[in-house]
């Protein structure tokens, strides 16, 4: 066992310790799903969505959000789900970097009654949970967030920007169209529901899909493509005997299903050739972490998984994962991603399983079966050897660039019989946004987890670099964390340090735990990005001579940083409106 593996084992064990400490009402206890035979249906691949046309020079998509039935296993009756364009998961949206996309999600086809019971004890389910809003809060509401996209607030799909099938609009709803500039590096991620108080229900019902942004640098790597580029969207669910999805009637803080669902199919198999494949793996579960490794049916050796990206950009170097790798397994908390190349060349005729070693709740060890063909002639494979990939150099970063270091202590307390999450001793959401980063500023956030369970922390708007973890935050990140990320695992008793630059847009953005039950139970709070240059703009939002004089005066009085003064000067010289 490598040093990384020992640390991973201890982290996993600590994260699971919460099960023995929480009140009985916080975990899901139910009758098991019907017994279903594994690996009797092929893995479905989500279709790639073609644009419906153009809108203001952007590819335009009009996507219906509806309720329908879908066969998730041959031995189950059809299951009622929600989805995008009549499919669960939704179709994949692909874009080139710099090519804008506009999307309109139309939920008018959803029923007025939710697929699952809505617990109105949770914030967001009644009007009193929406400050400054006294309108109706329908049971069925949706809003779609493109996880990991750099967007202005109006297009970010934030939790109080929902709409209902009957046309009721949430307090911060802005437009039916979401305008996505796609002006960022290569990305593999998900679009998913993000509605205040019912995200866990809407996502569990099926409201998520994949999107990707491709760059020329990615194409030049020679990664497996076409039929050899396979997405794996991992989830866990429970079923009733009639095929319907089971979810608890009252809120539980940790839902763990007993059945693996991958790309909308229960325990599927994949027929692969003895050659290299690319896998884009997303943990789309409500709460469950997946600790992934390959296992051989015969007990023989397994191919190494070579991770080259964590969802954004690229890692500093390719990380081999497996018995002889730098890591024994790939640990993904909810909504983390891992992008891999696996070479099946030496395993013709064998059967392999993607297995889960994270021992959480109902045992869920097997996920997907790979059946490697044994052709008489080896298949052609022009893709690059993953051991010799020359990855683009990630953007440099330096801790000394940080203007501010912020302590973010995560804890819990019990209120009204519910586990409630706290930030620096205050219940999430009981106060206004505690942080106001300046546009362009780099900060260090120290995430100290004093609660009893794991938290995958996600920041909207930005990507960040993990710079330390462990009990005091001084241990190096895992090798497959050395790249741009938008979600980071913070285990109990651990301090995780991230370096983040707030750039692109000003305004209000949420950061939250991405365990959906935690998120719905108020473990979400905004940060507000402010542009200090705006303080020196006139009524036309332009820095004039008066504003420049004021800025110089503040700098001389040592109340304005030199960096901000230089930005004010540049803004005055340009004559442009302040962003």
Curated annotation (Swiss-Prot):
Any single Gene Ontology cellular-component annotation: extracellular region
Location, primary (coarse class): secreted
Localisation per UniProt entry: Secreted
Signal peptide limits: 1-31
Binding site for Cu cation 3: 194, 460, 512
Top-level taxon of origin: Archaea
Function: Catalyzes the oxidation of a wide variety of organic substrates, including bilirubin, syringaldazine (SGZ), 2,2'-azino-di-(3-ethylbenzothiazoline)-6-sulfonic acid (ABTS) and dimethoxyphenol (DMP). No oxidation of Fe(2+) or guaiacol.
Name of this protein: Laccase
């Amino acid at each position: 066992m490598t040093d990384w593996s020992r640390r991973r084992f201890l982290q996993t064990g600590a994260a699971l310790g919460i099960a023995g400490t929480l009140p009985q009402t916080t975990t899901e206890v139910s009758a098991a799903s019907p017994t279903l035979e594994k690996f009797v249906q092929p893995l479905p691949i989500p279709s790639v969505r073609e644009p419906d046309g153009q809108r203001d020079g952007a590819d335009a998509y009009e996507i219906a959000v509806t309720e329908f039935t879908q066969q998730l296993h041959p031995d189950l009756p059809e299951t009622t789900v929600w989805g995008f364009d009549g499919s669960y998961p939704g179709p994949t949206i692909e874009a080139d970097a710099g090519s804008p996309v506009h999307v309109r999600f139309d939920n008018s086809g959803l029923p007025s009654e939710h697929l699952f019971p809505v617990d109105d004890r949770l914030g967001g389910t009644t009007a009193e949970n929406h400050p400054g809003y006294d309108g109706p809060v329908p049971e069925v509401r949706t809003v779609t967030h493109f996880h990991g996209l750099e967007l202005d607030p109006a297009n970010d799909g934030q939790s109080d920007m929902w709409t209902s099938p009957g046309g009721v609009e949430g307090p911060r709803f802005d437009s039916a169209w979401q305008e996505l500039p796609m002006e960022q590096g290569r990305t593999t991620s998900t679009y998913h529901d993000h509605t205040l108080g019912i995200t866990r229900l809407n996502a569990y019902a099926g409201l998520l899909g994949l999107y990707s942004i491709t760059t020329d640098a990615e194409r030049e790597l020679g990664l497996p493509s076409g039929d050899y580029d396979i997405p794996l969207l991992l989830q866990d669910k429970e079923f009733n005997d009639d095929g319907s999805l089971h979810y608890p009637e009252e809120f539980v803080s940790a839902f763990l299903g007993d059945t693996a669902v991958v790309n909308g199919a229960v325990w599927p198999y994949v027929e692969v050739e003895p050659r290299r494949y690319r896998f884009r793996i997303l943990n789309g579960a409500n709460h469950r972490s997946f600790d992934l490794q390959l296992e051989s049916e015969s007990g023989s050796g397994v191919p190494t998984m070579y991770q080259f990206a964590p969802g954004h950009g690229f890692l500093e170097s390719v990380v081999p994962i497996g018995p002889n790798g730098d890591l024994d397994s790939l640990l993904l908390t909810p909504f983390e991603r891992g992008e891999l190349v696996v070479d099946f060349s030496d395993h013709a005729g064998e059967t392999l399983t993607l297995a889960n070693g994270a021992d959480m709740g109902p045992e869920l060890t097997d996920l997907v079966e790979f059946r490697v063909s044994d052709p008489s002639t080896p298949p052609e494979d022009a893709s690059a050897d993953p051991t010799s990939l020359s990855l683009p150099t990630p953007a440099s970063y330096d801790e000394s660039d940080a203007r501010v270091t912020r302590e973010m202590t995560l804890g819990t307390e019990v209120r009204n019989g519910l586990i409630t999450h706290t930030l620096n001793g205050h219940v999430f959401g009981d106060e206004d946004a505690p942080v106001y980063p300046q546009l362009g500023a780099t900060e260090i956030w120290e995430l100290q987890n004093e609660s009893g369970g794991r938290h995958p922390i996600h920041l909207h708007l930005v990507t960040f670099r993990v710079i330390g973890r462990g009990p005091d935050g001084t241990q190096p990140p895992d090798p497959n964390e050395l790249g741009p990320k938008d979600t980071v695992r913070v285990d109990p008793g651990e301090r995780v340090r991230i370096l983040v630059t707030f750039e692109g847009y000003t305004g209000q953005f949420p950061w939250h735990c991405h365990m959906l039950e935690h998120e719905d139970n108020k473990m979400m709070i905004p940060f507000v990005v402010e542009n200090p240059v705006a303080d020196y703009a006139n009524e036309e939002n332009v820095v004039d001579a008066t504003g420049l004089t004021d800025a110089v005066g503040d700098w001389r009085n040592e109340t304005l940083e030199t960096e901000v003064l230089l930005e004010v000067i540049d803004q005055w010289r340009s004559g442009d409106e302040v962003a």
